[in-house]
Amino acid sequence: MWKEFKEFAMKGNVIDLAIGVIIGGAFGKIVTSLVNDIIMPVIGRLVGKVDFSNLYINLSGQQFNSLQEAQAAGAATINYGLFLNNLINFLIIAFSIFIAIKQINKLKNFTKKKEEVQVEATEKDCPYCCTKIDIKATRCPHCTSVLEEATN
């Protein structure tokens, strides 16, 4: 059983997935910091010194000075400021992944086209029986017709 697990864990796809998850987690933290510490304070400053993470709708009817006070008191709140932060966070990550995948696909298509250009024909059609034959053949192995000229 240990041997099977070891073979499974050492396959390239599993290791690639693990590396992707680790890098993705780190990337997510960087983007979250970018949104919370750089982008949202600038946007908040532009729209009148608003801290978006502190924007909420109080559903309890009581008065609170901040979201933290409302949550500490157990009040029901709609935290639309945190939602906006998370939405911007998601959009940045989604756009970054879109750009990365677009570049990877472009690279794959470039190498695929390069490989297609290098492929040379190795077969031709017999003009008499229309079967595929070797391009260097001087006689068709199927219908035994003599071919005029071997093309290279």
Swiss-Prot record:
Location of the protein in the cell: Cell membrane
Gene Ontology terms for molecular function: mechanosensitive monoatomic ion channel activity
Protein's UniProt keywords contain Ion transport: yes
Keyword Amino-acid biosynthesis in record: no
Pfam families in UniProt: MscL (PF01741)
Membrane topology per record: Multi-pass membrane protein
Entry's transmembrane regions: 14-34, 81-101
Record-level GO cellular component terms: plasma membrane
Keywords: Cell membrane, Ion channel, Ion transport, Membrane, Transmembrane, Transmembrane helix, Transport
PANTHER family: LARGE-CONDUCTANCE MECHANOSENSITIVE CHANNEL, MECHANOSENSITIVE CHANNEL MSCL
Function of the molecule: Channel that opens in response to stretch forces in the membrane lipid bilayer. May participate in the regulation of osmotic pressure changes within the cell.
Similarity comment: Belongs to the MscL family.
Subunit field text: Homopentamer.
Designated name of the protein: Large-conductance mechanosensitive channel
